[in-house]
Amino acid sequence: FTEVTDLLIEDKLCQDAIHFHYERPTMGAKMGIQSDGYGGSPSEDQNLLTIFVIDYSFSEEVEIINKDELIRTLKKGANFINQIDSSLFRNSLEETSEEFIYTNDLYRQIDLINSYEIIFLTNKSERARIKEHDIKARNENCRILVIDINQIEKLKNGQNIPKEMIIDLEKDGNSIPVLTASVNNDYKSYLTVLNGDFLAKIYEDYGHRL
């Protein structure tokens, strides 16, 4: 965990990484819960709550993680976020455990948090493509970042990982009006004008990830 997250922090893919493990398996229709750490205080990261989930394989061969496995684990991470403001869940945790301490710390900040991110760490190879709207926590779309064995090797070799970002403009009733500037066989170009308040709101929500 520490080796990989140190690389993520260095590459500015996350602000911080604090490790703890909590997992409750899925039972029938009752969604499981999983968290293997979080990205530090949301108040220090544009009110973004980042949760880490891990899927580690002990196989000597590199395994392929399929989309169903990936989504199932991500949803368990999202369910951990959903449970933070549940007194029933918090009271079920051992008071001396790390998960109790960190969950209560996050609960005290829950009203300040305005966005969520789940970072999936695995030594398997990921080939599925997950859109952000596939995973929700507290009725908000989660940003998803999958760091598989291939991405880890790139980080170790000093290669930057481009982080795809989807900005949901409709959530706040916004849009970007554009005018066609030119069209040719290779590409189309457009012109737009954005006001300062709009740009400030995007920066407030997405910060250094832009």
Residue ranges, per PLM feature:
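N-terminal extension/subdomain marker
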Residues: 1-210
